[in-house]
Structure formats: structure tokens, C-alpha cells
């Protein structure tokens, strides 16, 4: 895993996940659980402290890699977002690209990256 981190192979068996982290059969743009962000993180600044997300995973971050920090978690404590201190690496477990047509606030993630590469 990137920068030396590792994963739970099954968040339900290994991490005690209780939220719905697999979207099926719910439509892709409909949120299935909430995420809470860490104050001061980029995700917190752009999307707020708490928001609803879609979900398509059964694996999850166990230990983030070097220089990465957990900045978002679901209510069952599954990692939903990580960031590097310099703000150039941001990772999320949800799929904002599938939600932004119905939930335009998720476009802010893509706008942030577009500004970084200018």
C-alpha cells in the first residue's frame, strides 16, 4: 500500500464495520452513511465537519502510510479520508465523482486538485 500503509482486507470481519459500506443495490449517487472530518483538515475546510457519502468498499485503511493522517471516519470508525501534511495527497474511500451531479458540493474536491496543478 502507498507509503508503507496497510489495509483491512474485510472491514466487517477485521474492523468491526457496521455501516453500509457497499452501495449495492442503492443507486450510486445516493449517500448510504455519514463521515465526520477532523477539524483543520482540508476535507473539513471544504466539505464541513459532517456529510453523507456513497460507498463501494469492503476493504479499508488499517494503518495509513508514512506522512499520511486519518482525517475522516464513518460512524463505525472506518477510515474514509486521509491527507498528507502538505495537502498534496488526499484520499477518500467514497466516490465524489459519482455524487457531484446530484450533490454539487463534491465538485470542490476536483476544483482543489485543478488549482494545485495550475
Which residue stretches match the model-derived regions?
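Amide-donor transfer/coupling interface in amidating biosynthetic enzymes
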Residues: 12-118
Amino acid at each position: 500500500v502507498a507509503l508503507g500503509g496497510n489495509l483491512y482486507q474485510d472491514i466487517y470481519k477485521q474492523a468491526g464495520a457496521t455501516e453500509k459500506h457497499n452501495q449495492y443495490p442503492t443507486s450510486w449517487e445516493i449517500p448510504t452513511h455519514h463521515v465526520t472530518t477532523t477539524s483543520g483538515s482540508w476535507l473539513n475546510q471544504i466539505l464541513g465537519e459532517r456529510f453523507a457519502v456513497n460507498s463501494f468498499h469492503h476493504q479499508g485503511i488499517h494503518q495509513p502510510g508514512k506522512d499520511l493522517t486519518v482525517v475522516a471516519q464513518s460512524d463505525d470508525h472506518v477510515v474514509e479520508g486521509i491527507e498528507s501534511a502538505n495537502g498534496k495527497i488526499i484520499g477518500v474511500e467514497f466516490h465524489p465523482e459519482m455524487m457531484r451531479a446530484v450533490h454539487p458540493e463534491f465538485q470542490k474536491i476536483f476544483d482543489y486538485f485543478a488549482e494545485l496543478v495550475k
